[in-house]
């Protein structure tokens, strides 16, 4: 029984292990957004954990914006500092961007050495759930919690594979439709060129006959 529990713990730890990203964003007077992209399925819960150094009023203003590839904005937060936790549920299966801008205040415009360090951790689906709360609410044993977590993670992986398969089929259908259109367009162009060439030959023959050249 212990070996099974140990194996489940190792598997669940491996599945849920996500290394936090370490970012260093310099402060500028006209900053460009620095974005991290991830993919999420429809109606999937996402939790974004952010830890930054510095504090409000230190000459830098770190702003955050989370938006997906379809234009849906999930969060916008200005002048973040310290630890910030943001949760949201996706509207569609799409990629989403977590974008930071680090604005340098004007009074420090001559100082180009300001940098805001960020530790970013993004969890989605089963990894984003509070399993301690689930265990307490449903009175589950640790092994049962691990099994539930693995089950949900497996279901999510299966869903992602189904999405990728459906996407590949749509792309294949699009390619086949495009190839068919290109084929018929090529036939039309060739037919038009042949017809134009035949017309030019007839026109030149008529012209030369009228001019008594042939």
UniProtKB/Swiss-Prot annotation:
Cytoplasmic side of membrane: 205-214
Domain annotation GOLD: ranges: 33-124
Membrane-spanning ranges: 184-204
Main localization (coarse): endoplasmic reticulum
Topology class, membrane: Single-pass type I membrane protein
UniProt keywords, alphabetically: Endoplasmic reticulum, ER-Golgi transport, Golgi apparatus, Membrane, Protein transport, Signal, Transmembrane, Transmembrane helix, Transport
Membrane-side (Lumenal) residue stretches: 21-183
Keyword Transmembrane included in the entry's annotation: yes
Span of the signal peptide: 1-20
Family: Belongs to the EMP24/GP25L family.
Keyword rRNA-binding assigned: no
Superkingdom of the organism of origin: Eukaryota
Record-level GO cellular component terms: endoplasmic reticulum membrane; Golgi membrane
Gene name as annotated: ERV25
Record-linked InterPro entries: Emp24-like, GOLD_dom
Protein name: Endoplasmic reticulum vesicle protein 25
Summary of the function given for this chain in its UniProt record: Constituent of COPII-coated endoplasmic reticulum-derived transport vesicles. Required for efficient transport of a subset of secretory proteins to the Golgi. Facilitates retrograde transport from the Golgi to the endoplasmic reticulum.
């Amino acid at each position: 029984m212990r070996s099974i529990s140990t194996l489940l713990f190792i598997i669940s730890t491996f599945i849920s292990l996500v290394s936090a990203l370490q970012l260093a964003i310099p402060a500028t007077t006209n900053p460009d957004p620095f974005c991290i992209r991830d993919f999420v399925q429809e109606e999937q819960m996402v939790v974004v954990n952010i830890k930054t150094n510095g504090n409000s009023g230190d000459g830098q203003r770190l702003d955050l914006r989370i938006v997906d590839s379809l234009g849906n904005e999930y969060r916008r937060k200005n002048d973040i500092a310290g630890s910030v936790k943001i949760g949201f549920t996706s509207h569609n299966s799409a990629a989403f961007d977590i974008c930071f801008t680090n604005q340098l205040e004007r009074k420090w415009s001559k100082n180009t050495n300001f940098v805001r360090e960020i530790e970013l951790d993004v969890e989605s689906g089963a990894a984003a759930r509070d399993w301690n709360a689930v265990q307490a609410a449903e009175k589950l044993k640790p092994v049962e919690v691990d099994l539930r977590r693995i089950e949900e993670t497996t279901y999510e992986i299966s869903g992602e594979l189904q999405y990728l398969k459906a996407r590949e089929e749509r792309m294949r259908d699009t390619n086949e439709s495009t190839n068919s259109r290109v084929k018929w367009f090529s036939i039309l162009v060739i037919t038009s060129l042949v017809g134009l060439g035949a017309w030019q030959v007839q026109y030149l023959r008529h012209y030369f006959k009228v001019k008594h050249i042939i």
